[in-house]
UniProtKB/Swiss-Prot annotation:
It comes from Escherichia coli. This is Transposon Tn7 transposition protein TnsA. Changing D28A: No effect on recombination. Its EC number is 3.1.21.-. Mg(2+) 2 binds at Q130, V131. The gene is tnsA. Keywords: DNA recombination, DNA-binding, Endonuclease, Hydrolase, Magnesium, Manganese, Metal-binding, Nuclease, Plasmid, Transposable element, Transposition. Its cofactor is Mg(2+); Mn(2+). One of its GO terms (biological process) is DNA transposition. The active site binds 2 Mg(2+) ions. According to PubMed:10704304, no transposition occurs with Mg(2+). GO terms for molecular function: DNA binding; endonuclease activity; metal ion binding; transposase activity. Mg(2+) 1 binds at D114.
Amino acid sequence: MAKANSSFSEVQIARRIKEGRGQGHGKDYIPWLTVQEVPSSGRSHRIYSHKTGRVHHLLSDLELAVFLSLEWESSVLDIREQFPLLPSDTRQIAIDSGIKHPVIRGVDQVMSTDFLVDCKDGPFEQFAIQVKPAAALQDERTLEKLELERRYWQQKQIPWFIFTDKEINPVVKENIEWLYSVKTEEVSAELLAQLSPLAHILQEKGDENIINVCKQVDIAYDLELGKTLSEIRALTANGFIKFNIYKSFRANKCADLCISQVVNMEELRYVAN
């Protein structure tokens, strides 16, 4: 769901292709767009993935909701965000369909699909998702570009879906609002160092409610009330602690939380910057 002002010249497009944008799998994938490069009308997010072992670039809360849902699904193997649809393919589709190709200052622009997903044990081995606010579907030009995108994936014989804010699970929305309603702590080395002791506590207190345990830890170590929960919140918001996004965070037991065991420090610094 690229925003306005993310246009590129032919030279810039060629450079991005040479850089490997939109290429690779898993931890080696490079998204066509990053949060630094695209103005956003809302919040953008950089979040670590347990599945891919890299930081993902999400341009809205709606993209985040879809990403967290995909991250939780055990059948999902790989998530590639901001996947480019190169003009070498889409230009001919536009001609055949009679739809004007996106052009800025005389240059055919690269369209992008928000997510290309690889799966196992599901109805599809691979599928694509475009994320849009429901209100955007009232715009005729938006619908035209979506039709180009639909035809692109149809030619590839890959199922393509549109996801809007109307489809957001209310519990998922609640969790996102709680995790990201205020600026979370940056992922410093000091904060990351808390993962190991937190993992021990979560294992030891497995059947107890996470909120109650956080209060117990604060009291036991004479910490400011809310300190432990704040650390868990920051680590969870940045993807280093995983939980069932379809269940209210406050209702989770300690055993419901999964702490990342492998963290790429270079990627970690990138999240914090």
